[in-house]
A protein has these predicted regions:
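Catalytic core of membrane glycerolipid acyltransferases/transacylases, capturing the structured
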Residues: 3, 9, 16, 30-87, ...
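Proline- and acidic/polar-enriched loop/turn elements at helix boundaries
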Residues: 26, 63-65, 87, 111, ...
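Soluble or luminal CAZymes and related metallo-dependent hydrolases
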Residues: 2, 6, 88, 169, ...
Length: 190
């Protein structure tokens, strides 16, 4: 937590200064309680962008390959949860569930990887929807639009109203999540 706060105070302002991200829909971010933020994935900088919008610590779900070597300690210090994408990683979901049970925040990119296709979004994997169905945490969709450039069209993140998860199965939650993000990107012309 200390390391995360240190970065928030010193690194995040530098990020904001360089990229001047535009943030829309802040009113859709719950002030307290367990939250799952889920949206499209364009760049390694997406995690930094999402973290700059929130004061509370975000525990990101990230591919386990990032935890090899010296970088592993860095990601662990940030509270990042490693995910083995080659299998259905029950231990990663269990660790995320523990974060949510304590009222924490999970950040996840359900596409599972950077979207380098011409599609608006790649098909979402079911992990975010499963976590939401199981935990009943607020599931807040977001869409990242634009580019991380110092000059020109700036990157933008837009948060949408939380998806209702009570009394719903993971499939219907996942369908609504993917459609919300897709529509947000299509309306913003990505």
């Amino acid at each position: 937590m200390f390391f995360y706060r240190f970065l928030y105070v010193f690194i995040w302002p530098l990020f904001r200064l360089l990229f001047h991200p535009k943030v829309r829909g802040r009113e859709n971010i719950p002030k307290s309680g367990a939250i799952i933020f889920a949206g499209n994935h364009k760049s390694n900088l997406d995690c930094v962008l999402l973290a700059t919008c929130l004061w509370r610590q975000v525990h990101f779900m990230a591919k386990d390959e990032l935890f090899r070597g010296a970088a592993g300690g860095f990601f662990r210090a940030l509270g990042t949860i490693p995910v083995n994408r080659r299998i259905r990683d029950a231990s990663a979901l269990s660790e995320a569930q523990k974060v949510l049970e304590t009222g924490g925040i999970i950040g996840i990119f359900p596409e599972g990887s950077f979207n380098r296709t011409k599609e608006t979004v790649m098909p979402f994997k079911p992990g975010a929807a499963r976590m939401a169905a199981r935990s009943h945490a607020a599931l807040v969709p977001f869409a990242i639009k634009g580019k991380y450039t110092v000059i020109g069209r700036r990157v933008e993140i837009e948060f949408y109203p939380a998806i209702e998860t009570a009394e719903r199965d993971a499939a219907s939650i996942g369908h609504e999540l993917e459609n919300t993000v897709r529509e947000g990107l299509e309306n913003g012309k990505r």
